[in-house]
Amino acid sequence: RWGEVANIKGEHIIGGKVIFMETKNGSRRVIPIAKALESLIKVKATGRLMNPSYAIVRSAIRTVRPDLPVGQSVHVLRHTFATHFMINGGNIITLQRILGHSTIQQTMTYAHFAPDYLQDAVRFNPVAELSRFCP
């Protein structure tokens, strides 16, 4: 989420992880990042790491994908990440935690581009077996 990224500080990036302190749903969230990415984005040890100008980020994204709806530039990156995460064999529960969703249903809307993986989530669901014991 743009608001979360805009507030990242150097002290929030520790050992290959980003700690989001101020999230949309109010809970702290930790996500893993590659060491190479950490060295690129952690340009200082403390304080804000970037100019939180949405217009600058939107402009950069628009040069790559100019047909995005207004207000959706950064948001589409979340969908793209979710899609590729699932296509690469990611776990829907892990994706839910990374995206900071409170329900799995929210996460499933993000992963709608990878229906085969969602079917696996249903097929391998151990709770589904419990339904045979319920009338």
Residue ranges with predicted function:
Residues N125-P135:
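C-terminal secondary-structure termini that scaffold catalytic or DNA-interacting sites
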Residues K17-I19, R48-L49, S73-V76, Q106-T109:
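Conserved beta-strand positions that form and line the central face of beta-propeller blades
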Residues E22-G26, A34, L99, T103-F124:
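Catalytic-site neighborhood detector that most strongly recognizes the C-terminal catalytic loop/helix
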Residues R1-I41:
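Conserved tyrosine-mediated DNA breakage-rejoining catalytic core shared by Y-recombinases
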